[in-house]
Swiss-Prot record:
Compartments, record wording: Virion
Lineage: Viruses, Varidnaviria, Bamfordvirae, Nucleocytoviricota, Pokkesviricetes
Role description: DNA-dependent ATPase that acts as a 5' to 3' translocase on single-stranded DNA and thereby plays a role in transcription termination of viral early genes. Uses forward translocation in concert with the viral RNA polymerase RAP94/OPG109 subunit and the capping enzyme/VTF to catalyze release of UUUUUNU-containing nascent RNA from the elongation complex. In addition, acts as a positive elongation factor to assist transcription through problematic sequences.
InterPro entries referenced in this protein's UniProt entry, alphabetically: Helicase_ATP-bd, Helicase_C-like, NPHI_C, P-loop_NTPase, SNF2_N
Keywords: ATP-binding, DNA-binding, Hydrolase, Late protein, Nucleotide-binding, Transcription, Virion
Main location class: virion
Positions of region (Binding to the cap-specific mRNA (nucleoside-2'-O-)-methyltransferase): 457-524
Binding site residues for ATP: H55, E56, T57, G58, V59, G60, K61, T62
Enzyme class of the recorded protein, top EC level: hydrolase
Transmembrane feature ranges: none
Record protein name field: Nucleoside triphosphatase I
Domain of life per record: Viruses
Helicase C-terminal domain segment(s): 367-532
């Protein structure tokens, strides 16, 4: 049915031929062609009630949305605009963008923070105050967070955000309102999020049905047929976050580096205690204690179970203060720092004080030592992602920075009042090369919504639970024109994943999480393909054989059809002769996978999914006694 969707897209574009490409307020900006296109379609089809902007980080989702909001009155006089956003993003980018380019709509805007404990009450209170003659346009920024907060917990408890989700799914189309969801990563943790998002945008279209069978999408054709026009898809980088990507005129080159560091004997001892504690307390599935242990360890492992919280907190504070005092008036000599900046380690001619300090710091954290060395050797500015703030996280890392003489700013939950200003200073043209501020260390608070310019190295100290979060983190630094001020030879970003290792060769929590991410991505890639093939851009570019229409009366019927996955595609099991192989998608062998090569030269993954044909002259590397094909 994509031809039918194409006819409506064509109709919307014909209706909006004269829509200006510039947006003017106190400042003027000219929209990119893809921004203008999606705005014209969404505004040109009044009965298009909802749309997902699946745009990668840095291509201007906020700008596109503000343009749409500015032109809402082209189709109806009275609008109330409700923006559901994270608190950290209200001022920048949202208010700043609106004030610059569409100040006239500020009086119509209501900002509500969906992280607020009273979010539900605030939302419905504001809904009641809206004039009955007004139409409503709801914006959900970083909608994957909103969806995640609306999922029913494993214990069956319904979360407060769910009532807002239910209201929007029932009301937007019924009352002729509009809604835009924004995300660079619309699916983060589970396939259920896809179902939730689809049913928010197209209520009731995707009932409780199994989307996958043996990790294969049951009926992709049915989904694409029924979900046409669901989203706008602007994703220039469709590669895995672990793949290298060449640069372009607008985007910096990305190179991924896996930095494996060996934990000290002391760290390994604490790590094993953390693992045992997780098993005893039943929290091993979260791996928090082990993740913290791979990052930094005190001289002892403080037990938390069956203890007064105040007593436990006091012990942590004492350990921190003891460590801080041990570094008082200590720092590396200029000679040592010059050595580190060359990318070298201390030699036999180094001072006893430098060697002693380095040894003490490395014993407690091989990761922090590695990051500090990497920052000093970097030719430009750096970002460091550390999700933990206290105990073994940012609070400790900053002590390392001080000893290594690394200038820095912090973007985390404990710098709420200063972090926006600090990032602005970090991004100033005068600091393009990191002359004033070398590094920004950020927690999950900085994973979304902010932009960094002229970054050359990102260090990721802790694996997240999903590839989407990693994309958000890396996307802070690789954005449209983010390196325009950087010298041409430095328009690159090295992404360093710091992975801890045990001396006995057993996998660490870092390696476990890496495997989890790869497992999830198999299903997500198929769903992202559905988004791509149902997008306005794909349909407009690929469906040309349609009959023009002169009204939009059939749009609602077209997009309200239920999806039926009961008639599954016929999947025939075949016995194929061939050999088992190992393969990798990276020249640096960041991930090595089992596969199968048939006698006909076709290559399959471990689940039997066809990948591609074996090249005539394949690239082969030897690793740990295995022949690894590089595809």
């Amino acid at each position: 049915m994509s031809k039918s969707h194409a006819a409506y897209i064509d109709y919307a574009l014909r209706r909006t031929t004269n829509m200006p490409v510039e947006m003017m307020g106190t400042d003027v900006v000219r929209l990119k062609d893809y921004q203008h296109f999606v705005a014209r379609v969404f505004l040109g089809l009044d009965s298009m009630h909802s749309l997902l902007l699946f745009h990668e980080t840095g291509v201007g989702k906020t700008m596109t949305t503000v343009y749409i909001l500015k032109h809402l009155k082209d189709i109806y006089t009275n609008w109330a605009i409700i923006l559901l956003v994270k608190k950290a993003l209200i001022e920048d980018p949202w208010m700043n963008t609106i004030l610059r380019y569409a100040p006239e709509i500020t009086k119509d805007c209501i900002f509500i923070n969906y992280d607020d404990q009273n979010f539900r009450n605030k939302f419905f209170t504001n809904i009641k105050t809206i004039n009955s003659k007004s139409r409503i346009c709801v914006i959900i920024d970083e909608c994957h967070n909103f969806i995640s907060k609306s999922l029913i917990k494993e214990d069956g408890k319904i979360r407060p955000t769910r009532s807002v989700y239910n209201f929007l799914s029932k009301t937007i189309a019924l009352k002729n309102h509009k809604m835009i969801c924004l995300s660079a990563t619309p699916i983060v943790n589970s396939v259920q999020e896809f179902t939730m998002l689809v049913n928010l945008l197209r209520p009731g279209s995707l009932q409780h049905q199994s989307l996958f069978e043996n990790k294969r999408l049951v009926n992709e054709k049915e989904l694409v047929s029924k979900l046409g026009g669901l989203c706008s898809y602007i994703v220039n980088n469709e590669f895995s976050i672990f793949d290298d990507v060449e640069g372009s005129a607008s985007f910096a080159k990305k190179t991924v580096l896996m930095r494996y560091v060996n934990m000290s004997k002391k760290q390994e001892e604490i790590y094993q205690k953390a693992k045992l504690t997780e098993i005893k307390t039943g929290i091993s599935s979260f791996r928090i204690l082990r993740r913290m242990a791979t990052t930094f360890t005190f001289d002892s492992f403080p037990e938390r179970q069956n203890r007064d919280p105040g007593e436990y907190a006091q012990e942590i504070a004492t350990l921190y203060n003891d460590f801080k005092r041990s570094l008082r008036d200590r720092e590396f000599s200029k000679s040592a720092l010059d050595t580190f900046k060359k990318g070298e380690l201390l030699g036999g001619d180094a001072s006893a004080a430098d060697i002693s300090l380095f040894t003490e710091l490395k014993e407690k954290s091989a990761k922090f030592i590695d990051v500090c060395l990497g920052i000093l050797a970097s030719h430009g500015k750096c970002l460091v992602f550390e999700p933990f703030v206290n105990q073994s996280g940012i609070e400790i890392l900053l002590l390392y920075f001080k000893v290594f003489g690394i200038s820095n700013i912090e973007f985390s939950s404990r710098t709420k009042d200063t972090r926006i200003k600090a990032v602005a200073e970090f991004n100033q043209e005068s600091n393009t090369n990191g002359e004033c501020i070398k590094t920004c260390v950020f927690s999950s608070s900085g994973g979304e919504g902010i932009s960094f310019f002229s970054i050359n190295d990102i260090f990721i100290l802790d694996m997240t639970w999903n590839e989407a979060s990693l994309r958000q983190i890396v996307g802070r630094a690789i954005r449209l024109n983010s390196h325009v001020l950087t010298p041409p030879e430095r328009r690159y970003v090295n992404v360093h994943f710091i992975m801890a290792r045990l001396s006995n060769g057993m996998p660490t929590v870092d390696e476990d999480l890496f495997e989890i991410i790869q497992s999830k991505s198999k299903e997500f890639v198929q769903l992202f393909r559905v988004f791509k093939h149902t997008s306005l851009e794909w349909i407009h570019a690929n469906e040309k054989d349609f009959s023009p229409i002169d009204n939009e009366s059939g749009w609602k019927t077209l997009v309200s059809r239920a999806i039926d996955l009961s008639s599954k595609k016929n999947i025939t099991n075949k016995l194929i002769e061939g050999t088992n192989i190992w393969y990798s998608n990276s020249n640096r062998l960041m991930s090595i996978n089992r596969g199968f090569k048939g006698v006909d030269g076709r290559v399959y993954d471990v689940d039997g999914n066809y990948l591609h044909d074996m090249p005539d002259n394949p690239v082969i590397k030897i690793h740990d006694g295995k022949l690894i094909y590089i595809f």
